[in-house]
Amino acid sequence: KAVSGSGVGELSSSSLKRWSAENSVTMSSKVSGMNTLLSVSARTNNPEPGFQLINQRITHSTINDNIWASLQNAQIQALKTLDQRPAEKFAQQMYETRYADDRTKLLQENQIAQFTAADALAADRQLFSSPADITFVIVGNVSEDKLVALITRYLGSIKHSDSPLAAGTPLTRATDNASVTVKEQNEPVAQFSQWKR
């Protein structure tokens, strides 16, 4: 099935897994800094399903309400028990001190409760920034002409869609110093975090 019309975007989760297996295509994603990294593997002689999957990921993703309810509950419980995790609490304080920006503050319980599955999906799509900014790193023996045609077909229209993916505004730095200090402890020289989604 192609993406447009009766495409990958309309498949259920189980059907999508079966479709992926039949087409030998897999995808994983993670957030790194301000970027969302998508890793897609497909057959060298048939890369098209890989682009169909990227298109589906950006334009047709949904979040099941029941799953979102359990994620919400987990976040609320984590918020309530933050005092029991001093390392996380310290990292959060360091984050808030580093940036003079309200977005660094932890969400309150009532804010998490008001967040819907649709809101979560919209936030997820924000991570992609502008589709014009998508950078491809191709590993494999595939002709450039073939790739350009696929990129144009499956991703070229996304930036002109009805729901553009707006880029988020970068956080405002509170200080130009190399490090900030919280409770007489210095910030680590480098801190790198990864989230698997």
Annotate each PLM feature.
Residues 4, 11-59, 72-80, 85-112, ...:
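M16 family metallopeptidases and their MPP-like homologs
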Residues 1:
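His-Asp-centered metal-binding catalytic motifs of divalent-metal-dependent phosphohydrolases/nucleases
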Residues 14-22, 61-80, 143, 162-176:
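Acidic/histidine-enriched alpha-helical segments
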Residues 113-117:
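A conditional alpha-helix N-cap/helix-loop micro-motif detector
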Residues 48-50, 67, 149:
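Solvent-exposed, non-transmembrane alpha-helical starts
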Residues 19, 23, 57-60, 150-161:
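Conserved short hydrophobic interaction patches
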Residues 105, 130, 135-197:
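An aromatic/glycine/proline-enriched structural segment found at the starts
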